Regions:
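Extended catalytic core of nucleotide-activated donor transferases of GT-like folds
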Residues: 1-129, 146-156, 283-284, 288-290, ...
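Catalytic binding pocket for nucleotide-activated donors in carbohydrate/polymer assembly enzymes
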Residues: 1-17, 21-28, 108-110, 120, ...
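Nucleotide-sugar donor-binding catalytic core of glycosyltransferases
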Residues: 1-9, 129-309, 328-334
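Short, hydrophobic beta-strand segments that form beta-sheet elements in well-ordered domains
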Residues: 22-24, 92-95, 114-118, 137, ...
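Residue-level detector of structured alpha->beta connecting loops
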Residues: 45, 88, 259-260, 299, ...
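Short regulatory "switch" loops immediately downstream of catalytic or recognition motifs
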Residues: 55-64, 173-176, 345-354
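Intrinsically disordered, low-complexity Ser/Thr- and acidic-rich flexible linkers and loops
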Residues: 67-73, 189, 194, 352-364
Length: 410
């Protein structure tokens, strides 16, 4: 996905006259030599590095070297030589996960570093724990498959009535027993602590990982400082991943056990616990382009937010740009740009929580299921919702829009 996003942004920058140097992280040492030659030859030009999720900022060979100190230049945060501080190039890093995932890389960040976050709660986290980092909120975007009319010539996208799939979900699923390996080597007291945090967050899905994590840490350690709190946050990855996959399973289970078929593109759906696994139509792994192609052939695209409470995920924007109606839980940001039943279908995570607590009583999810079944019988209404969503997203939520905002930061 990150490579796909990069290509989309690069298209815009090339279109407005910028030259693009692609750095190959799979051949980092060779690519570094090419980069160094290119940089030395074009030193008078202005360079900006653009990356996602700290790729190229993780100590990769070539870009980071412990036995070399050109010009004797060192990062204020590290004693290793690195190309970014040697060159002084501005590095813009788009972080599409919670910053707690990248604690160690933030501590070793380049001197001329700018971070883009896609959730305003992540911005608050950065301002609190990394106040010296320049941070900007730019919401996630999507890609319109048929923008050039190559996929479907008759219209902007395939009409709802002609789409072969009722419901699609793109993305992977990882069950708890696999995620548990992240903390199994800890002492039992620590395991119990993180399991308790997970239990509380699962029971209160409106809360953020920041809120629940800090609450429990302060209850456990009364005098904990912000610095100590920050050091404890990375292990909350276990909680964050678990809660998102837990609700992903609940959403899919609620639909398939009600007789709806859900087409999945991604790994791990054989682990979903439900009464009617035959209604999960597993297509296996798929890359970003394949996922987009399949979304453009589905009537409804299911989404479960990766615990973004004030941001968006590319999955719902991709759905809107490709003619599928997005069925998703909400966030404060999504509430600002979408209206339920007009250009999107919202469901409530509290409903899924109560569904599980009831022993998976179908009466709990019946209003959502009935709504979906009725809409699947009403192609005109689904088409209207899809068209309304497309009109919202086509001019303001594409990667060109992200690139325009990045250009202002350059």
């Amino acid at each position: 996905s990150l490579e796909f996003f990069s290509v989309e942004i690069a298209k815009y920058f090339e279109k407005i006259g910028h030259k693009i140097f692609w750095y190959n992280l799979f051949l980092s040492e060779n690519s570094f030599e090419e980069l160094l030659d290119y940089y030395n030859f074009h030193k008078k030009d202005e360079f900006v590095a653009l990356t996602f999720n700290f790729e190229g900022l993780e100590g990769e060979a070539g870009l980071y070297q412990s036995d070399k100190a050109l010009d004797g230049l060192h990062n204020e945060h590290t004693s290793r030589w690195n190309f970014w501080d040697y060159s002084g190039i501005k590095v813009i890093n788009i972080v599409v996960d919670h910053p707690l995932y990248y604690h160690k890389y933030l501590a070793d960040r380049p001197h001329n570093y700018v971070q883009i976050d896609i959730d305003r709660i992540h911005i608050d986290y950065m301002k609190r724990f990394y106040p010296d980092v320049r941070t900007y909120f730019i919401p996630s975007a999507g890609t319109e498959v048929n923008k050039d009319k190559r996929a479907y010539k008759e219209d902007v996208y395939m009409p709802v009535k002609d789409r072969p799939m009722d419901i699609i979900f793109t993305g992977n699923y990882t069950p708890k027993h696999i995620l548990r390996k992240r903390i199994d080597n800890m002492e039992q007291d620590y395991i119990d602590f993180y399991e308790n945090v997970l239990e509380v967050l699962t029971a209160h899905p409106h809360m953020t990982i920041d809120e629940v994590g800090e609450k429990h840490l302060r209850e456990e350690f009364l005098d904990i400082t912000d610095s100590q709190l920050l050091d404890c946050m990375p292990t909350m990855m276990y909680v964050d991943l678990n809660v998102r996959f837990h609700y992903r399973q609940l959403a899919i289970r609620a639909l398939v056990d009600a007789g709806l078929k859900v087409h999945t593109y991604g790994e791990g759906y054989n682990y979903i616990e439900c009464q009617h696994p035959e209604n999960i139509i597993q297509h296996g792994s798929a890359n970003s382009q394949q996922c987009l192609d399949k979304i453009s052939q589905a009537k409804i695209s299911l989404n479960v937010m990766p615990w973004f409470k004030d941001g968006a995920h590319d999955r719902e924007i991709n759905s809107c740009l490709n003619g599928a109606v997005s069925l998703t839980d909400s966030s404060r940001y999504l509430d600002e740009i979408f209206t339920d039943d007009e250009n999107i279908l919202f469901y409530d995570l509290n409903m899924l929580r109560d569904y599980e607590a009831s022993g998976y009583n179908p009466e709990v999810t019946e209003p959502m299921v009935r709504r979906i079944k009725e809409l699947l019988q009403d192609n005109d209404r689904l088409q209207q919702i899809a068209d309304n969503a497309y009109m919202i997203c086509r001019d303001t939520h594409c990667w060109d829009n992200v690139a325009e905002e990045l250009a202002d930061i350059l």
